[in-house]
């Protein structure tokens, strides 16, 4: 494959490949979409085991719509099976199949309807303005830790009824859990070191939840935790609630903060698009929002497992137990679906991106909340800090699962 490496010869579990050259990586995925869209990637040159890498938008959609053939509950949804000692904490609804998945999703979705989230708009607006008021007075900040991370974290904390004093702990714990392959968050990068740190962070979050749940049973407030512990036959078990809590505080702040940060980088790098949106915000609010999610693709991949022998994907026959990895980053650059996919275009419409997963039972539960947070945030930023811009290169998370940004210097004229 001249001009690009082969995915099959460059294992996608090799973190150095993901961080060596972004342009080379994009060329590799593009070449595969054209010539070899479903390569079998071996975990090492000496191993026969591996996974099928799906690089085309249509394959990602198809697999997502066929949960009876491609399961989520067999070993988890990341490339490698989770260690047994972590499954107790990490197995949430994203790692389940129906009917259990449908039962739990119905319960936890009570607090995430479009109607209930629209009622949060004023809370989000107030939170954005509060965060802006806390920015350093010298006109320089770490956009991630000072702005992008606090917004979704405070909103999800408010929804759950988590007191503000726990905010920093949740930020640090979710960094450990979702950024486990990065030495900034877990210095001991041995398998034992990672498992120990992730377990400790997970246990800390569960202990926080247990304290909150006990309080809500005695003193219900109407927040999401109060709804989940309300006495009815469909309630979550304590173990189910613990896993959901870890998922919600993690996905509810990590993925959104990364979309926000990549959005700021894109708007800085494409000032014409920034000005177009700023000058007529309402006309482009929805399309710009969706383009940021496509451009960012905060979650790089999820995995499915083949449910039985003889499952067909296109002309490829698959075997029970084989792993199939959906590379959303590649699907969101598919030239057969998106015109000029490497162009950031706030007017792009339609925009059938797969940044929230694809159609099917596992479409992101928090998609509506994430969209609302971005729409509100950038509107207020354009009004309050019109010259806010990224300054320098982002410090990227070492991961092949999350397209994360740990730090991003930014400048602005103080208010």
Residue ranges and their predicted role:
Residues 1-415:
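Cytochrome P450
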